[in-house]
From Swiss-Prot:
Belongs to the NDK family. CDD domains: NDPk_I. It comes from Yersinia enterocolitica serotype O:8 / biotype 1B (strain NCTC 13174 / 8081). HAMAP family: NDP_kinase (MF_00451). One of its GO terms (biological process) is GTP biosynthetic process. Keywords: ATP-binding, Cytoplasm, Kinase, Magnesium, Metal-binding, Nucleotide metabolism, Nucleotide-binding, Phosphoprotein, Transferase. Major role in the synthesis of nucleoside triphosphates other than ATP. The ATP gamma phosphate is transferred to the NDP beta phosphate via a ping-pong mechanism, using a phosphorylated active-site intermediate. The keyword Magnesium applies. This is Nucleoside diphosphate kinase. GO terms for cellular component: cytoplasm. ATP binds at residues 11, 59, 87, 93, 104, 114. The active site is at 117 (pros-phosphohistidine intermediate).
Length: 141
C-alpha cells in the first residue's frame, strides 16, 4: 500500500466539547502521523470557498454557518491508504448510520454537526491540504 496524505477537520462542535485530544489519540493509535495542524476560526469566505462544490445545495448555508460558529482544528494526516482509512475511522456522514466506535458515532451531534471532515479522494486531499497549508507548514516525520 502507498503512503498517502489526507486532510482532516475537527468541527466546531467537537472542539467546543474538548474532544481534540481524544480524536488525535484515535488518529495516532490508528497509525497516522499528524504532520501539520492548526486551530482556526473560519471566516465565511474561507468556509464558502472550501465547500464551494456544495454551493446551491439545500444544506450549504447551514453548513457554512455551522463551520464558522467556532474554532476548528485542521490537520494533515499521513499513513498507508490514509484517505480510505481516515474515512473508515470517521464513520458514516450521518451519525445515526455510523458504526459504534467510529468518530461520528462517538462525537457527532447531528448530520451537520458530525464532528469531523475528511477528504474523499487523494485528489481532493491534495486540493484541501493546499487550501489551508503552505508546503513549509507540513512537517513529514
Amino acid at each position: 500500500m502507498a503512503v498517502e496524505r489526507t486532510f482532516s477537520i475537527i468541527k466546531p462542535n467537537a472542539v467546543a466539547k474538548n474532544n481534540i485530544g481524544a480524536i488525535y489519540a484515535r488518529f495516532e493509535s490508528a497509525g497516522f502521523k499528524i504532520i501539520a495542524a492548526k486551530m482556526l476560526h473560519l471566516t465565511k469566505e474561507q468556509a464558502e470557498g472550501f465547500y464551494a462544490e456544495h454551493k446551491g445545495r439545500p444544506f450549504f448555508d447551514g453548513l457554512v454557518e455551522f463551520m464558522t460558529s467556532g474554532p476548528v482544528m485542521i490537520q494533515v494526516l499521513e499513513g498507508e491508504n490514509a484517505v480510505q482509512r481516515h474515512r473508515d475511522i470517521m464513520g458514516a456522514t450521518n451519525p445515526d448510520n455510523a458504526l459504534a466506535g467510529t468518530l461520528r458515532a462517538d462525537f457527532a451531534d447531528s448530520f451537520t454537526e458530525n464532528a469531523v471532515h475528511g477528504s474523499d479522494a487523494v485528489e481532493s486531499a491534495q486540493r484541501e491540504i493546499a487550501y489551508f497549508f503552505s508546503e513549509n507548514e507540513i512537517c513529514p516525520r
